[in-house]
Amino acid sequence: MTTLKLNTLSARIQAHKMALVHIVKPPVCTERARHYTEMYQQHLDKPIPVRRALALAHHLAERTIWIKHDELIVGNQASEVRAAPIFPEYTVSWIEKEIDDLADRPGAGFSVSEENKRVLHEVCPWWRGQTVQDRCYGMFTDEQKALLATGIIKAEGNMTSGDAHLAVNFPLLLEKGLDGMRAKVAERRSRINLTVLEDLHGEQFLKAIDIVLEAVSDHSKRFAALAREMATAESRESRRHELLTIAENCDIIAHEPPKTFWQALQLCYFIQLILQIESNGHSVSFGRMDQYLYPYYRRDVELQQSLDREQAIELLHSCWLKLLEVNKIRSGSHSKASAGSPLYQNVTIGGQNLVDGQPQDAVNPLSYAILESCGRLRSTQPNLSVRYHAGMSNDFLDACVQVIRCGFGMPAVNNDEIVIPEFIKLGIEPQDAYDYAAIGCIETAVGGKWGYRCTGMSFINFARVMLATLEGGRDATSGQVFLPQEHALSKGNFANFDQVLADWDNQIRYYTRKSIEIEYVVDTMLEENVHDILCSALVDDCIERAKSIKQGGAKYDWVSGLQVGIANLGNSLAAVKKLVFDQGAIGQQELAKALAEDFDGLTHEQLRQRLINGAPKYGNDDDSVDELLARAYQTYIDELKQYHNPRYGRGPIGGNYYAGTSSISANVPFGAQTMATPDGRKAHTPLAEGASPASGTDHLGPTAVISSVGKLPTGAILGGVLLNQKLNPSTLENESDKQKLMVLLRTFFEVHKGWHIQYNIVSRDTLLEAKKHPDQYRDLVVRVAGYSAFFTALSPDTQDDIIARTEHTL
């Protein structure tokens, strides 16, 4: 078996990492806000795609650039290290409200200088009434606004941040280079017919792409010039040589395809960076990096030996730390659902390729190098994912477990055995299905060929819909009734449990439809107001169709719905079925009163203990609850299938919805807005995250958990089925334990058809100490949901949620 070196970092990489993790309250950068405002004001006569292209070009030409930390990969998002840019075209309302309190937010604090406050107070008023968020609220119906105000449905993220959740076509970029991409645009423009309305709009889009690609080239040359200037003043010969190489790399990739591994990695990083300058959307991912960079790695490391493996790993480390520098500021409410300010920049390795119609294992030496580099660095970025398949070698699986044992929540593992065949059933070409990658948290898509948002825009609070089901359609938190129904526990008029399920079906269909209606508004406003030019240029077939992704330019376009509180739904329904209807141990009105009073008082607390201990819980391989949850969830899946997204019929294959379970950290704020539930959960406490069991309810070990998850209709939940498991570090101390985990992984994926799994390998005691002494644990990384975060950067509520999760042994 290959033994990875997992305890080695070069001095400069260690210093760079420590410098970043000790930035507790990063600054805000207003350069982008100022530059975009200037260009929008100057070019009001231009079509929006051209206006946005000119704004991005102006910003790339004028913004502050720097090279620090003896880095080998260069490029900064903002004027200061880890500073978060402001994107006023999406929203200014929360910025103006929260600007003076940003430093005091728990787990998501930012420092704002007086000068930056002055700039924001200067630029924000101009944007009032014309941001994406403002225009969404101008289009929402009163009913939609009321639903959003209650928080049963939450859709703030895309109104205030944009889309993303995709990987662009890095292989095409590497093949053609920036000049080659401009030539592709020029050829398409040569076939434009300006007497055709669609082509008239298409010409403006293609013109915008050319402006942006030229700006990206010039931006690369700015870094080349800076590196040369720094080299002249550098006294260390080795660093001077590195700076000159950086300059040469940046000059070459400004126009030509890269020739070396270093150049290829630099070009990919520049694009990754500028995508996150163009748009504030997160989960911009690299796709299958071990596949498209391997030819360069093979040439430099294996054949010509112009670069040794350790040098290649240091280049990867430099790239990973540059990803960690990228930052994003969210509103106070949105930051609670994305605890730890994550960017979800996913890198996928492993899996299979389709060669002459036959699947072949895709693992190569770069797969191991990327895996090892992440294991050594133990950072939150990139979000590393491994594609598992039945033919994966024990050697590579063993290497993955070695890194899992490092305890930073990576790699997450996705399952080819379910994703690929289900993608092919959808209508994805087999060659593309075998080329899928993890996106953001656990979502999956085909890099460079899939539209935005392979995961949904809005979250539905399943627990609150369930409570409305039990109480005449009344939302227990707000008191509002959106879909009235006859039956209510407080009336004692449910004749049987079948009526409960029937009312659930009606309620979840209503809320699902309303979430799609809301997404339609947001999608439309994003399409009309914030064309993402560079991103569209690097997704097939946007150039050929002369359409942005939002206009239907992508080859594929499916979107998943999202929800929070899956396990709470199953556990609550199971408790009601068994204790109220099957046994008659608890009366309908008795339960309604206990829930309304949050189990206050001795009698209600005794009832609560019966709900907790006397009813089955999801995660323990109990069919009575697992199958009930699957049945309730199936209604949601079936309803989603009824709808098309706004790109349907406009070009892409697909254009439909399917389910997904990535709840990020929304289970904590959603729980804070949810009253007591029949599973015994108290009001205002966290809900279950993803498809994982509710904290503390999975008592029979990890094997029982994976069996329960496998009973969900995973083949229909193509947006991903997120399973977090927490293991005590002592569980993986010896070779025998490692083998147990490997067997568990193979069983989960091959027998139970699991979609995804990830592990926290950290003890409760360590987490409690880190909460008590944060300065001593700044580099402690934990798995939150489909992403990892620095534990001390999380809010206390999210820290407590992670501490409370069940700690298993093998």
Question: Model segments located where?
Answer:
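Extended non-globular scaffold/tether segments
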Residues: 207-218
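Short amphipathic alpha-helical segments enriched in leucine
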Residues: 221, 225-228, 574, 807
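Heptad-repeat amphipathic alpha-helical coiled-coil interaction surface used
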Residues: 217, 224, 228-231, 240, ...
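Conserved catalytic cores of very large enzyme subunits
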Residues: 2-206, 238-245, 249, 253-810
